[in-house]
Swiss-Prot record:
One of its GO terms (molecular function) is methionyl-tRNA formyltransferase activity. It comes from the Bacteria. It catalyses: L-methionyl-tRNA(fMet) + (6R)-10-formyltetrahydrofolate = N-formyl-L-methionyl-tRNA(fMet) + (6S)-5,6,7,8-tetrahydrofolate + H(+). Keywords: Protein biosynthesis, Transferase. This is Methionyl-tRNA formyltransferase. It comes from Lacticaseibacillus paracasei (strain ATCC 334 / BCRC 17002 / CCUG 31169 / CIP 107868 / KCTC 3260 / NRRL B-441). Pfam families: Formyl_trans_C (PF02911), Formyl_trans_N (PF00551).
Amino acid sequence: MTSVIFLGTPEFAVPILEGLIAQHYDILAVMTQPDRKVGRKLRLAASPVKQAAQKHDIPVLQPEKLSGSPELAQAIAMAPDLIVTAAYGQFLPTKFLEAAKIIAVNVHGSLLPKYRGGAPIQYSIMNGDSETGVTIIEMVKKMDAGDMFAQAKLPLTRADDTGTVFAKLSLLGRDLLLETLPKIIAGTATRTPQDPDKVTFSPTITKEQEHLNIHLPAKALDQWIRALRPDVGGYVYLNGQRTKLWAITPLSAGSTLPAGSIVERDKHRLVMVAGQQTTFQVDELQPAGKAKQSIADFLNGPGQQLVSGQQVITDDPE
C-alpha cells in the first residue's frame, strides 16, 4: 500500500483527501492549518480537512508555522512514499519535500503556468477568462513552479463564482490526481516543464481589492463581484454607507450619467451606472450591519429614499 502525507485546509481539499482514502492509499497523517476563530461569536473551528481526517481516525498535524516545527520533524520521520498537497496555505521546506520516497505533488487550481499563487480561481473569474482548470505538478522549492504531469480544463460561465468553481475544480482535481498518481508511481508519467514566458501570478486577495471600483465597465464589475463571492463579498460606499454588492446583472443599455448614479428605480428594480457609460441592475446587496437583501426588500426598506438621477455610490465614504 502506497503511504501518503496529505496537506490541505479548505473544502477544496476534502474530496481529494476522500478520494485517496477511497482508493486505499495509506494516509499516515494529515497536515492542515491550526483551528481558527470564525463567525461573529469567534468560536474556534477546525478546518474542513481536519474534520474529514478525524472522521477517518487519521492523525492530524497543525503547526502554526511548519518550518522548524516539531510537526515537521515528525512528518519527515514518517518517510512517506508520497506527499500530496491541495490548498494547504503554507510554504513547504525543501527537506520536507525531499522526505517523500517517490515524489511530492500538488493539485493546483489553474492551468499552469498561468496563475501561480494562492488565488488562481478568483483571478480567473476577475479577468473574465473563458476557462480554468487544474494542474498536477511536482512540488519544488519555488512556488508552483514544478514540472507538470497532467491538466484538465473547466469552462467558465457568468453563472460561476469562486464558490461554484472551487467545488467543480475540487472534483476535477480529485479525479485527475487519482488518474495520474499510478503513472507517477510506475514511472510512466510524462513531465512537462512550465514555459517561463507564460508565467502569471495570482497573489492572495487583499482587503483593498474588496473595495469595488464603480468606474469599471459593468461586465468587469460583475466579474469582480463574482470573484469575491461567496466568502468575502465586494463593497461600495452607497450614500456613504459601506454596502456589499453580492449580485448584479450587466445591461446592454448605456447612460451618460456619472458612474455610481441611479438610472432607473421602482419598487422592484434598481439600475445604476458603472464605468464607460455602461449600466447594471442590482440584484442582491447587504447594507452594513444587516443581512443580505433582495433588491426589492432593500428598496422598500433602507433604500426608500433613493431616486433616479442621484449619484449615490462614491469612491470614499462622505
